[in-house]
């Protein structure tokens, strides 16, 4: 189970900290939250603006924009909304954890128990760093649970099976069934499916 109730309690409120467009990510996270009975608070990061800042070499502006988004997230987390679940990109998750650390707090201290996170930076190395340095260790040892996610408009959100140190923090995404089904066909006979394991 990729969103265990223990860490993503039904009825919990969520914070969505990441891009709302041009993709459907915000809608997917918001729907998941509402389907599970909670309210989703959204902080939008515009990836198109981020790309423009990077292309212009305006790294100071980029850092200010990131700080602006993090400050909004902190305001929501401080407002008593009992947020237990979070979606954030890896860079924003790290920035949020560091901002909380500067205040003498942590992601767990503000009540977050489960995190969806996804983005191009998501690697086994980053997952290990996040687990050990940002989330207080593995969830089985009292840390915050994190589910790596990958998605696109056609498929939707695919979650990884639980990521653990024993597997080298390997990330294995599973497409949402039955919406996304993968089939391998014989290139010489496109009407013929290839048997599993062939």
Each model region followed by its residue ranges:
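Conserved short alpha-helical elements in the N-terminal third of ANL/AMP-binding
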Residues: 26-42
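Active-site glycine/GP-rich loop and adjacent strand/helix microenvironment
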Residues: 39-198
């Amino acid at each position: 189970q990729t969103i265990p109730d223990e860490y993503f309690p039904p009825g919990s409120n969520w914070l969505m900290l990441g891009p709302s467009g041009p993709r459907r990510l915000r809608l997917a996270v918001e729907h998941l939250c509402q389907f599970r009975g909670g309210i989703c608070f959204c902080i939008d990061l515009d990836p198109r603006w981020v790309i423009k800042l990077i292309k212009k070499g305006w790294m100071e502006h980029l850092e200010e924009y990131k700080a602006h988004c993090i400050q909004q997230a902190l305001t929501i987390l401080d407002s008593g909304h009992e947020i237990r679940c979070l979606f954030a990109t890896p860079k924003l998750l790290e920035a949020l954890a560091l901002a909380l650390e500067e205040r003498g707090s942590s992601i767990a201290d503000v009540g977050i128990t489960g995190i969806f996170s996804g983005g191009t930076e998501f690697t086994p190395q980053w997952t290990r760093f996040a687990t050990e340095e940002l989330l207080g260790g593995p969830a089985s040892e009292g840390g915050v649970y994190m589910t790596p996610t990958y998605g696109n408009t056609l498929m939707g959100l695919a979650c990884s099976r639980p990521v653990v140190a024993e597997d080298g923090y390997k990330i294995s995404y599973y497409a949402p069934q039955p919406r996304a089904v993968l089939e391998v066909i014989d290139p010489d006979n496109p009407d013929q499916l290839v048997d599993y394991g062939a």
